[in-house]
Curated annotation (Swiss-Prot):
SUPFAM superfamilies recorded: L-aspartase-like
Gene coding for it: hutH
Protein name per its UniProtKB record: Histidine ammonia-lyase
Gene Ontology CC, one term: cytoplasm
Family the UniProt entry places it in: Belongs to the PAL/histidase family.
Organism: Deinococcus deserti (strain DSM 17065 / CIP 109153 / LMG 22923 / VCD115)
Length: 499
């Protein structure tokens, strides 16, 4: 991939997860050089410019002598690299490397091309700085995590390479690279940004789209297993309230359910209408769809943005302090997605109850053969309920909390990284809950006696290739984990969509 002015989520995923190599375009390199020239002019002159020849945060009014400008940037990195917690996953770090390079490549930060080259070299070599997960307050960007990233560039800290965590200087030497000696503005250019938030959010958004499709499939399978009505999913129904997500969800449900033999078999039954968790799937799942669409629009802007401060304008030679580093757009988006994904899990768990509670259907209690001797999927619903309840706490918006920092110079922060990390937890839980629903729905279909809709039937048969029918109680966790892998890999959804 050639890094220039734009970066899509699809390109991001190709680099971060599929390790597509990245190189800097010639035009991007030219932009970087032009911005650097402005910094060199400032260094040679008498003008006081924040972050170039002054201190940082509350120390912005302290002028730093020219002979100490390199030390200033070095001090910035080592002092700010004080995050804590478990190391971030490699894919999150890869996303940070890519997004930081992308932002610098837009040519308004003033770092030298060598800085971007080393970021991309680490990325392409799959040499990943070890970055603690906690420490960002989301303004000025993700300072502490990005300082740990920058630490590796100067030969300090640790790098995960070849499956081992080793001293950064040792890995750089093995790969034939010299540690950077940061020059004026470069330390600040590396750490002022929203790249942790952006990386977490992009990865979660990609996975949430896949989960949404799988949740639609799970809902369709449950509808079939419970002999539910297809009429609420008709185009004429959702067309009277045509939110885009609801329209799309109903279309997908109809595709999964087409040519069902189950629906005609109960056409004359006396049931008037189904529970909300079945009947209102287009409206509930559709609202999540629309939230994901909005998040995609936010990321499209963010991936083409400069989140540094101060900003360099090479055409005029101006250097302007602003607030592009503030994570609020991403923080609010992460919080919205937390709720949207949590609701997918919430309604999925309620469909599990519909499948397992004998008072709500004609199915055996907990889908257990010889109930009493066997407990069936009784505790599977407990697990789903536990995860849904945990999500309710995690879904509390992180962005409504702000703690002033830097002696009140930075008096409002976004907490966006906190929200984005919570989003990943919620998403992981939701993937498990939907997997539990699929496990229950597949077992319920064993009692159907008719073929389900084409998409549902294909998914059911694929599940049965990995998870056999429950004949008696057994150790169910391995079954759930195998099914969860079908969900998270996208394999199950692909089979249903291609049927």
């Amino acid at each position: 991939m050639i890094l220039d002015t734009t970066l899509s989520v699809e390109q991001f995923i190709a680099v971060v997860r599929r390790h597509e190599p990245v190189e800097l375009s010639d035009t991007a390199r030219s932009r970087i050089v032009r911005a650097r020239a402005v910094i060199e002019q400032i260094v040679d002159g008498d003008q006081a410019v924040y972050g170039v020849n002054t201190g940082f945060g509350k120390f912005a009014s302290v002028r730093v002598d020219r002979a100490q400008l390199a030390q200033l940037q070095h001090n910035l990195i080592v002092s700010h690299a004080i995050g804590v917690g478990e190391p971030l996953p490699a894919e999150v770090v890869r996303g940070m490397l890519l997004l930081r390079a992308q932002s610098l490549a837009l040519g308004h930060s003033g770092a030298r091309p060598e800085v971007v080259d080393l970021l991309l070299a680490l990325l392409n070599a799959q040499a990943h700085p070890v970055i603690p997960a906690q420490g960002s307050v989301g303004a000025s960007g993700d300072l502490a995590p990005l300082a740990h990233l920058a630490l590796s560039l100067i030969g300090l800290g640790q790098i995960e390479y070849g499956g081992q965590i080793r001293p950064a200087a040792e890995v750089l030497n093995e790969l034939g690279w010299k540690p950077l000696k940061l020059q004026a503005k470069e330390g600040l250019a590396l750490i002022n940004g929203t790249q942790l938030m952006g990386s977490l959010l992009a990865l979660a958004l990609h996975d949430a789209w896949a989960l949404l499709g799988t949740a639609n499939l799970a809902a369709a399978m449950t509808v079939e297993a419970l002999s539910g009505s297809h009429r609420p999913f008709g185009a004429e129904v959702v067309g009277l309230r045509p939110h885009p997500g609801a329209v799309h969800t109903a279309e997908e449900l109809r595709r999964f359910l087409r040519e069902s033999q189950i629906a005609p078999s109960h056409a004359s039954c006396g049931k008037v209408q189904d529970a909300y968790s079945l009947r209102a799937v287009p409206q509930v799942h559709g609202a999540t769809h629309d939230a994901l669409s909005q998040a995609a629009r936010v990321l499209a802007v963010e991936f083409a943005s400069v989140t540094d401060n101060p900003l360099i304008f090479p055409d005029t030679g101006e250097v302007v302090s602003g607030g592009n580093f503030h994570g609020q757009p991403l923080a609010l988006t992460a919080d919205a997605l937390k709720v949207a994904v949590a609701e997918l899990a919430s309604i999925s768990e309620r469909r599990c109850e519909q499948l397992l509670n004998p008072a709500l259907s004609s199915l055996p209690g907990f889908l257990a053969p010889e109930g009493g001797l066997n407990s069936g999927f009784m505790i599977a619903q407990y697990t789903a309920a536990a995860l849904v309840s945990e999500n309710k706490v995690l879904a509390h918006p992180a962005s409504v909390d702000s703690i002033p920092t830097s002696a009140n110079q930075e008096d409002h922060v976004s907490m966006g990284a906190h929200g984005a990390r919570q989003l990943r937890q919620i998403l992981d839980h939701a993937q498990t809950v939907v997997s539990i629903e699929l496990m229950c729905a597949a077992q319920a279909l064993d009692f159907a006696g008719f073929r389900a809709g084409i998409g549902v039937q294909a998914a059911y048969e694929h599940i049965r290739g990995a998870v056999p029918t429950m004949q008696v109680d057994r150790y169910f966790q391995p079954d759930l984990l195998r099914l969860r892998e079908l969900v998270t890999s996208g394999d199950l959804l692909r089979v249903a969509q291609e049927a």
